[in-house]
Amino acid sequence: MLEQMGIAAKQASYKLAQLSSREKNRVLEKIADELEAQSEIILNANAQDVADARANGLSEAMLDRLALTPARLKGIADDVRQVCNLADPVGQVIDGGVLDSGLRLERRRVPLGVIGVIYEARPNVTVDVASLCLKTGNAVILRGGKETCRTNAATVAVIQDALKSCGLPAGAVQAIDNPDRALVSEMLRMDKYIDMLIPRGGAGLHKLCREQSTIPVITGGIGVCHIYVDESVEIAEALKVIVNAKTQRPSTCNTVETLLVNKNIADSFLPALSKQMAESGVTLHADAAALAQLQAGPAKVVAVKAEEYDDEFLSLDLNVKIVSDLDDAIAHIREHGTQHSDAILTCDMRNAQRFVNEVDSSAVYVNASTRFTDGGQFGLGAEVAVSTQKLHARGPMGLEALTTYKWIGIGDYTIRA
């Protein structure tokens, strides 16, 4: 089955690569229209997925992530229309010039070819990824979570209808709808057809992909994010940032999970933190140095376990650790961070500069929330993932990250001397 999908995707990628920006936008507009026109089919499929998930004991938070409503589906369709408004990077000349030989050389952006994406049970990801791949002239093979298999199948069928109505092959967007996990291992070895693989899931999936994939893998999305509270910080302003970074959307990968507090400000900062976290419903996981003082406050407090410094809670839980100084904070981030997003809150710009230079994460912030690590917030439009590695993309992956480049030389029957 996957072999045939790979063949179809590779053939479709050749046709997609030849489309103009106007033609690609016409396809995206048709997809958005069809998502709305066939919304009942998608919503009915989603209702079955949610019912099964509820019967299997999934939490209310997870059920909310799975569920589609008419308003959410319209929002997804509108997001596709927003992709139409983004600048198309394909065909852009990055640099070039005329060589001494007379050869005119340029470096031009081109599609990658076929993208494979393995992702969690979020129905919006199916459309988001498909629209970004089509905008950049790439075919895509999707493998979504089993909890949304009906929703994904219905959504991809709608997308394929739109593709065919525009004269394009259905193989441009395909989904593996069989939940058998053995197919993931098979997909990881499809280097004959898939040019880049993006896993969006937990640490186990990322480890599996790194160890078994014969395809170049872009890993990321696991966010053990830190905020270091420096001794020179303005406490009231710092608390606003921390509340935003922890509570705005706790289930996202750019949410802060560990707060590192300079020991010289702990006595004045911790009581204020406890009050604010109590109001926000956050449970604090405190180290020995912070535990007694936080237990005297109104927030719920438990003793931190050593392994929790490596946890991505994705919930209203926050580690709190007292550190000696900036060096201690940086050392902790180097040991426990995932190179996603880390921040310093300080009035000392020398410390800020050191933090920026020495913390090796894809996004580093000074006096700002980690929640900004997002394609839309960065002005990239939608994102296909957040990469925490260094090749070939880093941070939020917008349209440019779904392209590569080729060298084009134009001569006048020019030969090398």
Swiss-Prot record:
Principal EC category: oxidoreductase
EC number: 1.2.1.41
GO biological process, one term: L-proline biosynthetic process
Top-level taxon of origin: Bacteria
Chief location category: cytoplasm
Gene3D superfamilies, A to Z: Aldehyde Dehydrogenase, Chain A, domain 1, Aldehyde Dehydrogenase, Chain A, domain 2
Pathway it works in: Amino-acid biosynthesis; L-proline biosynthesis; L-glutamate 5-semialdehyde from L-glutamate: step 2/2
InterPro entries per UniProt: Ald_DH/histidinol_DH (IPR016161), Ald_DH_C (IPR016163), Ald_DH_N (IPR016162), Aldehyde_DH_dom (IPR015590), G-glutamylP_reductase_CS (IPR020593), Glu-5-SA_DH (IPR012134), GPR_dom (IPR000965)
Keyword Phosphoprotein: no
Pfam annotation, one family: Aldedh
Localization terms from the record: Cytoplasm
Any GO molecular function: glutamate-5-semialdehyde dehydrogenase activity
Keyword Cytoplasm annotated: yes
UniProt keyword terms in alphabetical order: Amino-acid biosynthesis, Cytoplasm, NADP, Oxidoreductase, Proline biosynthesis
GO terms for cellular component: cytoplasm
Catalytic activity line of the entry: L-glutamate 5-semialdehyde + phosphate + NADP(+) = L-glutamyl 5-phosphate + NADPH + H(+)
Matching HAMAP family: ProA
Family matches, as PANTHER family: DELTA-1-PYRROLINE-5-CARBOXYLATE SYNTHASE, GLUTAMATE SEMIALDEHYDE DEHYDROGENASE
Similarity-based family: Belongs to the gamma-glutamyl phosphate reductase family.
Function: Catalyzes the NADPH-dependent reduction of L-glutamate 5-phosphate into L-glutamate 5-semialdehyde and phosphate. The product spontaneously undergoes cyclization to form 1-pyrroline-5-carboxylate.
Protein name per the record: Gamma-glutamyl phosphate reductase
Species: Shigella boydii serotype 18 (strain CDC 3083-94 / BS512)
